[in-house]
Amino acid sequence: MVLTQQENLSVLVGQRFTCLLGTDLQLDPDGVSKWPWKSGIVRAASHKDLHCPEIKIFVEFDDEAWEKRTWIELYGATVKMFLVEHNLVLADRVSPSNSVPVQCPAMVYKVLVGKFSLGTATCLQFLGDKDKLFLSKELVKPVRDRETLKQFMQENKTFNKAFQELIRKSVDESRLQQATRNIIGMPINVYSMDPSMQWFSATISNVRTASRALEIKCEQLPSLKIIDPALLHVVLVHNYGDLNDKSRKPRAPKRKSQDTESEDQTELKQTRNEEVPSKDVTQKTSFLTYRRDDGKTLVVVDNPKATNNLFNYINTTTEDQQKVQQQSLSSKQSVPVGFGEALLGCAATTPGILNAATPPQANSPPSFGAATPQGKGTQNLPGDTTLLNGEAKREETNLFLSAAASQGNKRSLGFGMMESPSTFSSLSSMPSWSGQPKSENGPKSENLFAAFTNSSTVFPKGFEFSVKSFPEQKMLSVTDSPKTAPPMTCVQQQEQKVVKKPENNHTSVRAIKPQEPPYPKSPNKNDGVTYPRSILLDPQKLKRLQQSGDCFVQDGSCNDIAPHLHKCRECRLDRFGRSREQRDSAVFCRFFHFRRLHFNKHGMLKEGGFLTPNKYDAEAINLWLPLASNVVDLDLDTAKYILANIGDHFCKLVMSEKEVMSATDPSKQVAWKRAVRGVREMCDACDTTIFNLHWVCPKCGFGVCVDCYRMKKKSLSSGEDGNETFSWLKCVKGQLHEPENLMPTQIVPGKALYDVGDIVHSVRGRWGIKSNCLCSNKHVRPVVKPVVKEEVKPSTPEPEPTKAPLAQPNVCTAPDPIAIPSTPPTPACSSPLSWLTNLSQTTVNKENKDNLFASNLEHKPLPSFASFGKPVSALQTFGSSILTPTTSNNSGFLRNLLNSSTLKQETNEKSTPKILDDIFASLVQSRPLSDFARKPQGLPIQPSLMGFNTPHYWLCDNRLLCLQDPNNKSNWNVFRECWKQGQPVIVSGIHNNLNSELWRPESFRREFGDQEADLVNCRTNDIITGATVGDFWEGFEDISARLKNDKGEAMVLKLKDWPPGEDFRDTMLSRFEDLMNNIPLPEYTRREGKLNLAARLPAYFVRPDLGPKMYNAYGLITPEDRKYGTTNLHLDVSDATNVMVYVGIPKGEHDQEQEVIRTIQDGDADELTIKRYIEFKEKPGALWHIFAAKDTEKIRQFLKKVAEEQGHENPPDHDPIHDQSWYLDNTLRKRLLQEHGVQGWAIVQFLGDAVFIPAGAPHQVHNLYSCIKVAEDFVSPEHVKHCFWLTQEFRYLSHTHTNHEDKLQVKNVIYHAVKDSIAILKANEASLGKL
């Protein structure tokens, strides 16, 4: 059996240790046991990183009173040796009853700091003893043979009790360190740093899963709100008093657990009236399983039988569970000062969980619910950051040649136990260690080991037990699809099973959304990802595979499954301790659920190739199919709008994939890399997210995208291999990766991508959605979908698959495959969406990328307004809706258009709103170019004429829409007509709805003032380290309190990357809710907004982090500061809205108002903007300059020219815009307008204004006063094109650039947005006849 802890629990707090302290120690090398060892327990730590050279630990020694506790520097000069408890082993010990040496369980200690050599000796402590011994490593053996060990524990109560204490301690520590939701409401004891007390009591009010901190309520220390179990010792407290009532009916068990401490610690706690219930080891303990609160794994607990059982749990009714779920938890957060060094390095940066859910009982594990794939535990080398290991000794042999294999993990705490011929054979007849006669209840009292023989038992998250029988589980099928399958596409096959016709044809089919927190949390990497146990851990299936030699899919890491075979890159790095910290090494294995294995005739595990595209199962294919049952928060109208805007983009994506597939060598078998939950496939060369087709090395799993593969082949053919833009990593033993040795691999199973492409065309035709894609042009030679290459030799069916694979879909509705050219024919007329086609057939490199970007971002004209007379079902696409300004006089245009007879004849009640939208959109851009030079007069447009009751006005020479009511339900209709033109938009008045107390500087200073933070000097861009958040907030509105430079001048600072962490919601829950409840245009801006395409990405994938993010900075007021920017010119890959939540006017500076007015005027703001400041007394916060995305290349060339004039270099892997190294002052903006004709929008953002910035639009910010801004990113259907282009641009940035890595996954977003849209449209096809 194997008990391992999968988390990288490199945590010292709560662990027992033994050490040598002193400076001048005279030690006898042969008398290790006589050295002055001191043992104790670690109570607190200053840092989480054990390798930090400055880490200090707060310890209590066993032979001293707790009042003498002290801090010691772990790597200081006085610490000569430091050993911590490591894992469970067996060692010889003489039985007191008959003086016969027997092997007994013991805890071995691992050397963490070793300045002296122990030689061949190792430190261990027998379970139940306090003394530590030093024995030869040869006498220590790993634990084997579960059954005999179980019997040994039953007959020896001392070991039984100690082992249960050890297990319970590990369970409690795991729950606390993982911050599981089902500990909310539980009482705890927290170690006190106050000299007057050792412990104090508290209650867990909330958990923060990201930083794994606990929010607590404490009567003794009311100011203490947040603690981190990794830095301060925390133990769970359990109450078993209610179990005395034997008349209570059996109820579903509620998981509880209790911390274990040594007996002397318990006594100390009892002296402070903190008594712990007594424990009777003779009491029978039975085990049940239930699903964790997050539903991710199963947990072993005890079924309550009596009051004195160690693992009894309080029974709760359903009503009790509902009450727990409905508790309202406080979101206030603060870091206490009283903890001193104990909390050094601890930042409260995680979210609170609103609801505490009680886990339901489960009698068997889920089919996909094991915590990690099983395999062999690897021993950590010195380079690894892991403190605790789960295996006593690493063996470089095939782990699964025996019927019962072991499991482990490189990050295991561990109790590594492996099955083999019995090591406990002599224990069955051995007398009881305690010398007592066998109790009558002895044989029945299986205690902890009852779980080992239960096939449905799995230990808490982080623990696994390898047993002789396992439940049935899902396996990847590798059998060939039947050749006689009916001619149906994979989409049609699933539709017959899932999609049903709506009962009401007039109502769109909408899937019921599961109950979730009101604001979905941005998922962390591999958060809660679980997979079934390895097939090799089932003895029966293992034996069958060995006998038959059938192929099966690798379902664990290379190190665990087959250490003697080729290891992938991740597993090789993982083996040598150089891999990044990750929760589950198997999930990140390149060959996980990808490579096939089989046993040869000698029983050795061998490679059997890789999965092919036709080897999918229902779960794999459903992720990629348009199934209405999987779609939430999407209505019929929104689906049509999304498809009208991004349908052509999707078609070009499919065309590009077809062309690449058709250009591959027909002799090469295409592999299928199954999408792995919680893992983002990325190119190893350019860090771009891989959508589908890519090339993989079969030896190490190295993978490159289509573009990098094409560039490499071109550089090799031209003899310029040393000059390629992206270097390739080397393979095993340092060999170079040659393109011809890589295998083509796809991620989308089967022909699902091409099937969805066919459905897009048919659905758009049925619903009258206009399309401009190449594949809809009759003059273009049709490009049929490529046939997925079958294996040369069919594979042997997999033994006993739990879910039969779907029949190989026959989706060829077109003629037989024909030869497809490597580049598509040029259409008769250029399409506005030719950008993606050009991209797919053009090799982008350093020399031609600038010209490529410029040539494909040209402004395309539109048909005349006569097209508005067409049926409204022919929806406008993004490309076809871009309108160019006309030179005709627009006087009376709106009235004439409304009174036209054609419009009256063809307009009905349904189509009027859409027609008015188009009229409004055309009106925005239908002005003479000469009007740009006029001073702003405002455009008095009556809302009634627009068809919407939407208060608004115009700024920036009538080029900038400003919506005045953030709560107006019609805002998004008006907004999108300007938004689709690529124009920024302002929404004002948001501050009136916000809770102003939450956004004041005082509240931030009070809650987070002690946190360390990096500050940036806005004048010099220098980073100031060692400061605190409080230092920044103290000078926010007081110039005299600001930090000074070397000359004694107050610096203009901004907080860099604060608050830290991936999710704003984790750190500031109450502010997050306040913002999300009041953010304008929630259809676009909320995480689940129906027009936010990022919401369409399934939770199966790693969703992009789109904010919110805070931007806090002082104002630049002086005339000299006008050449500096708070945020220099840059652009973002996604759309964004930036809300001004607070404006602070600092005291201590004269003539601020006059300087602000001059700065606004110097920034080219219009008269209406100045009027808002002077007459309406609004608070101006920041001056923005935003430029159109189509002008990006002109600005780039202009800045390069200016850089050359100033003698600066322009490295090829850097970009003047992406580097954020320029601020365009008045002089540069005038040159840009005169030399390139580029004019942007000068916007002054007042308090409560939300500025919407389109994706790809260059912009810069200059704070006028001290500002607190919060930005939220989103992906709108109108700007997907720019998102994609920016992703391509970012590929060429240096690897140190913050924007280099592709986190948005535009192709995945496009695919799943289209997939969901057509699912809704197909489900509503029955309603077409009713329209």
Curated annotation (Swiss-Prot):
Obligatory cofactor(s):
Fe(2+)
Q: Spans of biased composition, class Basic and acidic residues?
A: 266-280
> What are the boundaries of the C6-type zinc fingers?
683-708
Q: Supply the CDD domains for this chain.
A: cupin_RmlC-like (cd02208)
Keywords annotated in UniProt = Chromatin regulator, Cytoplasm, Dioxygenase, Iron, Metal-binding, Nucleus, Oxidoreductase, Transcription, Transcription regulation, Zinc, Zinc-finger
One GO term (biological process): regulation of transcription by RNA polymerase II
> Broadest EC class?
oxidoreductase
Q: Where does the record place the region Disordered?
A: 243-280, 358-381, 497-532
Amino-acid positions noted as binding Fe cation in the UniProt annotation, renumbered to this chain: H1130, D1132, H1259
Enzyme Commission no: 1.14.11.65
Output the InterPro entries linked to this UniProt entry.
DUF7030 (IPR054294), JHDM2-like (IPR045109), JmjC_dom (IPR003347), KDM3AB_Tudor (IPR054503), PWWP_KDM3B (IPR054504)
Where this protein primarily resides, as one coarse class? cytoplasm
GO MF annotation list: chromatin DNA binding; histone H3K9 demethylase activity; histone H3K9me/H3K9me2 demethylase activity; transcription coregulator activity; zinc ion binding
Q: What is known of its domains?
A: The JmjC domain and the C6-type zinc-finger are required for the demethylation activity.
Q: Which family does it belong to?
A: Belongs to the JHDM2 histone demethylase family.
Q: Its function?
A: Histone demethylase that specifically demethylates 'Lys-9' of histone H3, thereby playing a central role in histone code. Preferentially demethylates mono- and dimethylated H3 'Lys-9' residue, with a preference for dimethylated residue, while it has weak or no activity on trimethylated H3 'Lys-9'. Demethylation of Lys residue generates formaldehyde and succinate.
Q: What is the recorded name of this protein?
A: Lysine-specific demethylase 3A-A
